[in-house]
């Protein structure tokens, strides 16, 4: 939907030869123009339609705000109501702890809740330094290893 609002003020013309003082300009009040346009098929563009547009916007905005508040009240329940209704929250991995609780000044790494931890079966001894030197830059060297390993 496209719309256009135009407003004209009936201000007195100002020219450099005018002898009107600033006080006389301040005493005159400007009025909003209510003239119709040349094309009578266009909707009325005057202060009445502007006021109606503003009033409609306020009413629709009030309805929307009321609607959002009522939907929020109906959908969002407090945790106390959920506990009273018998809804059990899902179990967290920290509730299934196998080690003793964290002690102050221990060097345990604190991982945020519900983030995956590295596997406990991983062994760092399997990774080691290569026995040979690195190949020089620009040379690609591949070896065939028949021991069930692969090369990258």
UniProtKB/Swiss-Prot annotation:
Task: Give the residue spans that cross the bilayer.
Answer: 48-65
Entry's induction text: Induced by abiotic stresses such as salt stress and methyl viologen (MV)-induced oxidative stress. Triggered by NAC072/RD26 during senescence. Down-regulated by cytokinin.
Q: What is its main location?
A: plastid
- Answer whether the UniProt record assigns the keyword Transport to this protein: no
Question: Source organism's superkingdom?
Answer: Eukaryota
GO CC annotation:
chloroplast envelope; chloroplast membrane; chloroplast thylakoid membrane; intracellular vesicle; vacuole
List locations, semicolon-separated: Plastid, Chloroplast membrane; Plastid, Chloroplast thylakoid membrane; Plastid, Chloroplast envelope; Vacuole
Membrane disposition = Single-pass membrane protein
A GO BP annotation: leaf senescence
Entry keywords, A to Z: Chloroplast, Membrane, Plastid, Stress response, Thylakoid, Transit peptide, Transmembrane, Transmembrane helix, Vacuole
- Phenotype upon loss of function: Delayed chloroplast turnover and senescence induced by abiotic stress and associated with an enhanced tolerance to drought, salinity, and oxidative stress.
Q: Does the keyword Nucleotidyltransferase apply?
A: no
Which residues are the transit peptide here? 1-22
Q: Tissue range of expression?
A: Mostly expressed in senescent and mature leaves but not in young leaves.
List the residue ranges of the region (Important for chloroplast destabilization and the formation of CV-containing vesicles). Answer: 92-152
Which PANTHER family would you find in this protein's record?
EXPRESSED PROTEIN, PROTEIN CHLOROPLAST VESICULATION
Q: What role does it play?
A: Triggers stress-induced chloroplast degradation, independently of autophagy and senescence-associated vacuoles. After targeting to the chloroplast, triggers its destabilization and subsequent disassembly, inducing the formation of CV-containing vesicles (CCVs) carrying stromal proteins, envelope membrane proteins, and thylakoid membrane proteins which are released from the chloroplasts and mobilized to the vacuole for proteolysis.
Assembly information from the UniProt record = Interacts with the photosystem II subunit PsbO1 via its C-terminal region in the chloroplast thylakoid membrane and in CV-containing vesicles (CCVs).
Protein name (database record): Protein CHLOROPLAST VESICULATION
Q: Which organism is it from?
A: Arabidopsis thaliana
